[in-house]
């Protein structure tokens, strides 16, 4: 909603004519080419309409690049199949070489204390049961020189310790009010499949 404002001014006609003539003179003065050189107006240039999504110049370049890579991979595969294998395969993409120095170079920023890395060794460990069955299992153990101040716990492997364990089990079985049964006997028949 636009509102129009009308003003009624009471101005003598002579004064009104003077104001109009002064305005016309100012317009003629600015419009005269001899007073000021006017810069040439450029014709109105319309902007290009925006390309639809996925059809712009960047998208077209990406699409062309992907097609070239795809064709390059296909051409390399065809070339490799026609050539006899020389032992070393050349990958189409550059991959890092798998040397220990390159793999661990990214890990240097993690530890800057200067402490040497802990070395791990695979050593067998033997576990002996009460029934004198011995199991030998592989175990990863850190080197003792790199373990800071960790006391080793003494392990009793003598026959006395086996006797102590057997005595403890027998006293536990005697103190229980129920008869000692095997785990299979206490299971329901449906679970055992009998």
Curated annotation (Swiss-Prot):
Region ranges (Disordered): 24-107, 170-194
Keywords: Chromatin regulator, Cytoplasm, DNA damage, DNA repair, DNA-binding, Nucleus, Phosphoprotein, Transcription, Transcription regulation
GO biological process: chromatin remodeling; DNA repair; transcription initiation-coupled chromatin remodeling
PTM sites of type Phosphothreonine: 90
Subcellular location: Cytoplasm; Nucleus
Gene Ontology MF term list: DNA binding
Skewed-composition ranges (Polar residues): 28-38, 82-97
Recorded superkingdom: Eukaryota
Modified sites of kind Phosphoserine: 86
This protein's record includes keyword DNA-binding: yes
KW Zinc (keyword) present: no
InterPro entries according to UniProt: INO80_su_Ies4
Pfam families: INO80_Ies4
GO cellular component terms listed in the entry, alphabetical order: chromatin; cytosol; Ino80 complex; nucleus
PANTHER family with a match to the protein in the record: INO EIGHTY SUBUNIT 4, INO80 COMPLEX SUBUNIT 4
Assembly and binders: Component of the INO80 chromatin remodeling complex.
The protein's role, per its UniProt record: Component of the INO80 complex which remodels chromatin by shifting nucleosomes and is involved in DNA repair.
Protein name according to UniProt: INO80 complex subunit 4
Lineage: Eukaryota, Fungi, Dikarya, Ascomycota, Taphrinomycotina
Record gene name: ies4
């Amino acid at each position: 909603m636009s509102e129009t404002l009308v003003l009624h001014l009471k101005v003598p006609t002579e004064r009104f004519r003077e104001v109009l003539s002064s305005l016309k003179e100012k317009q003629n003065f600015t419009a005269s080419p001899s007073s000021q050189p006017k810069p040439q107006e450029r014709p109105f240039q319309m902007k290009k309409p925006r390309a639809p999504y996925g059809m712009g110049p960047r998208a077209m370049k990406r699409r062309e690049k992907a097609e070239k890579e795809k064709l390059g991979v296909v051409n390399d595969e065809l070339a490799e199949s026609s050539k006899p294998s020389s032992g070393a395969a050349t990958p189409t993409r550059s991959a890092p070489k798998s040397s220990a120095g390159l793999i661990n170079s990214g890990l240097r920023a993690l530890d800057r204390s200067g402490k040497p890395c802990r070395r791990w060794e695979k050593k067998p460990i033997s576990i002996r049961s009460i029934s004198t069955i011995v199991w030998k299992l592989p175990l990863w153990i850190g080197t003792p020189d790199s373990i800071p101040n960790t006391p080793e716990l003494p392990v009793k492997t003598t026959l006395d310790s086996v006797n102590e364990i057997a005595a403890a089990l027998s006293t536990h079985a005697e103190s229980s009010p129920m008869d000692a049964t095997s785990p299979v006997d206490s299971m329901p028949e449906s679970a055992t499949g009998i």
